[in-house]
Amino acid sequence: MSVGLKVSAFLHPTLALSSRDVSLSSSSSSLYLDRKILRPGSGRRWCKSRRTEPILAVVESSRVPELDSSSEPVQVFDGSTRLYISYTCPFAQRAWIARNYKGLQNKIELVPIDLKNRPAWYKEKVYSANKVPALEHNNRVLGESLDLIKYIDTNFEGPSLTPDGLEKQVVADELLSYTDSFSKAVRSTLNGTDTNAADVAFDYIEQALSKFNEGPFFLGQFSLVDVAYAPFIERFRLILSDVMNVDITSGRPNLALWIQEMNKIEAYTETRQDPQELVERYKRRVQAEARL
């Protein structure tokens, strides 16, 4: 069996790996590429590509260990506001980015959960769905990442992530509704079921990034849409590059600029994983599944 072509479990929130698999070094890690790169579905269209910029991950040196089955229960509904995440889950990363961008680090406590060895009390006392992200606020617990980033933006102070104007609101809704289809398309290429699907999906992203010229982001200015896509584009970029020698930015200048500008936003970069560790964890999972 071919190894390196399955990604669905890697991106599912309930199957995310624990913090033991994530580098917690405060130093940044860089990954430079100098290779022939083939865009998915492009047949014989090869191009020689050399990256001059590093793929960076800024990892918070102050990250606390994830809570596991041996951890004492959190005192739920004691008046605190808590965001339950996993450091390796892209869905949880969305809510984490929103919390950081709003400047709520001192108002929303981050509670990392080890999803491979999760505490029983998390399901029993915190969130019956037993997934992350989950937000404890005003004596109730809310879930679902897209709902949470909207909730955080609406119910807490800080810079707005919601677009102004009806046109941008309509486009935002369309792009947010496409997130699942985007992920499924890229996964189908990685799984080998549709070699052209990722190419089509990233072309859609490239076109979407050209709609508004006020800035490099989906709606011109940084918004909920960027928060929703960033964790997945981050992972797909690294995995496609390493596993399939694919440069998703080749022929896509808007996407290349978007990635460059996203890497200037601290609220995002401080949630990122070490890129080499991310890819290695993916490969280990695929190898394990290939042996089943």
From Swiss-Prot:
Q: Where in the cell is it found?
A: Plastid, Chloroplast
- Catalytically driven reaction(s): RX + glutathione = an S-substituted glutathione + a halide anion + H(+)
Q: Which InterPro entries match?
A: Glutathione-S-Trfase_C_sf, Glutathione_S-Trfase, Glutathione_S-Trfase_N, GSTL1/2/3, Thioredoxin-like_sf
GST C-terminal domain segment(s): 130-286
* GO cellular component annotations of the record: chloroplast; chloroplast stroma; cytosol; peroxisome
Query: Any idea of its EC number?
Result: 2.5.1.18
What general EC class does the enzyme of this chain belong to? transferase
Q: What is its main location?
A: plastid
Q: Which UniProt keywords apply?
A: Chloroplast, Detoxification, Plastid, Transferase, Transit peptide
MF terms in GO: glutathione transferase activity
Per the entry, what span does the transit peptide take up? 1-56
Q: Where is the GST N-terminal domain?
A: 79-160
Share an example GO biological-process annotation for this protein: response to toxic substance
Sites where the protein binds glutathione: 89-90, 117-118, 131-132, 144-145
Q: Give the record's family classification.
A: Belongs to the GST superfamily. Lambda family.
Record function comment: Catalyzes the glutathione-dependent reduction of S-glutathionylquercetin to quercetin. In vitro, possesses glutathione-dependent thiol transferase activity toward 2-hydroxyethyl disulfide (HED).
**Protein name (database record):** Glutathione S-transferase L2, chloroplastic
Q: Which organism is it from?
A: Arabidopsis thaliana (Mouse-ear cress)
State the encoding gene. GSTL2
